[in-house]
């Protein structure tokens, strides 16, 4: 099943779409500079592109951690991104009252993994009629995503994307079950599946409120996931990850974006140049 996002068509058998940007909005200038680089690289490589960022990181481990610029300022920044670059935007919501104002500006609304079973939030998101990106919770099996999908269908919104972001593996660690991509496709009507590689690289350090990360393994993990014929890749970057206000250890250094995407596109082109081989 393919999904339209403005002039972009997203599907598991189509050339991959990049959902890329920064973890959280830090300022207007840094957002526009980062987005400009993404736009330049993706246009050069011929990759459909959707900008992503959060206006509020409502689930930070510490109450003292940076959360973002807030809803009102965030929507102003997203409007400027769309006006300057003419690209779609995706952001996440955390409470039902945020859904409609976000839907008026952003093209895709994201359901956070930790909130994916919250029925009131699902219903409010569905009512907007926007395309919805469902993050798979770390505690949920791929096949159980069908229950979340069914909630959206019951609320009359079938414009859905499924997003893998890793599964809990014991304490303080995430792993990605590569077989899970196929399971989500099979159990959820072949909805577009995308891979959030940078969040899948998160770790937790004992005694620390901040997330660690393994960005050195980002390319290996991204290639492994994209080899399963996915609709898109979800990627966060930062001009200087050491200075990022959230999830810097998992962020791809922005200057490596082009070389990173060249390799992803080469694999995606190869995989999708071949007919699907069904093994029963």
Swiss-Prot record:
Gene3D superfamilies named in the record: Aldolase class I
Pathway listed: Carbohydrate biosynthesis; 3-deoxy-D-manno-octulosonate biosynthesis; 3-deoxy-D-manno-octulosonate from D-ribulose 5-phosphate: step 2/3; Bacterial outer membrane biogenesis; lipopolysaccharide biosynthesis
Pfam families: DAHP_synth_1 (PF00793)
GO biological process entries: keto-3-deoxy-D-manno-octulosonic acid biosynthetic process
A molecular function GO annotation: 3-deoxy-8-phosphooctulonate synthase activity
Top-rank taxon: Bacteria
Chief subcellular location: cytoplasm
Single GO cellular component term: cytoplasm
E.C. numbers: 2.5.1.55
Family in the record: Belongs to the KdsA family.
HAMAP family: KDO8P_synth
Protein name as catalogued: 2-dehydro-3-deoxyphosphooctonate aldolase
Organism: Neisseria meningitidis serogroup A / serotype 4A (strain DSM 15465 / Z2491)
Lineage: Bacteria, Pseudomonadati, Pseudomonadota, Betaproteobacteria, Neisseriales
Encoding gene per record: kdsA
């Amino acid at each position: 099943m393919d999904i339209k996002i403005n002039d972009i068509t997203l599907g598991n058998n189509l050339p991959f779409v990049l959902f890329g940007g920064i973890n959280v909005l830090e300022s207007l200038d840094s957002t526009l500079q980062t987005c400009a680089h993404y736009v330049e690289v993706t246009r050069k490589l011929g990759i459909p592109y959707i900008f992503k960022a959060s206006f509020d990181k409502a689930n930070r481990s510490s109450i003292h951690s940076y959360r973002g610029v807030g809803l009102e300022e965030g929507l102003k920044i997203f409007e400027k991104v769309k006006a300057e670059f003419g690209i779609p935007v995706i952001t996440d919501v955390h409470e039902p009252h945020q859904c409609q104002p976000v839907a008026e500006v952003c093209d895709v609304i994201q359901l956070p993994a930790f909130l994916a079973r919250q029925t009131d939030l699902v219903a409010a998101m569905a009512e907007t009629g926007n395309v919805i990106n469902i993050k798979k919770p770390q505690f949920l099996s791929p096949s159980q995503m069908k229950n979340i999908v069914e909630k959206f269908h019951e609320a009359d919104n079938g414009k859905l994307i499924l997003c893998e972001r890793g599964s809990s593996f014991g304490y303080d660690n995430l792993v990605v079950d590569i077989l899970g991509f196929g399971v989500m496709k099979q159990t959820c009507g072949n909805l577009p599946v995308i891979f959030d590689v940078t969040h899948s690289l998160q770790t937790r350090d004992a005694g620390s409120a901040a997330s660690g990360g393994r960005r050195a393994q980002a390319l290996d993990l991204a290639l492994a996931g994209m080899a399963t014929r996915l609709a898109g890749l979800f990627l966060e970057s930062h001009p200087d990850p050491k200075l990022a206000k959230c999830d810097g250890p998992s962020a791809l250094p922005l200057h490596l974006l082009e070389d990173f995407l060249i390799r992803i596109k080469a694999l995606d082109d190869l995989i999708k140049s071949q007919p699907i081989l069904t093994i029963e």
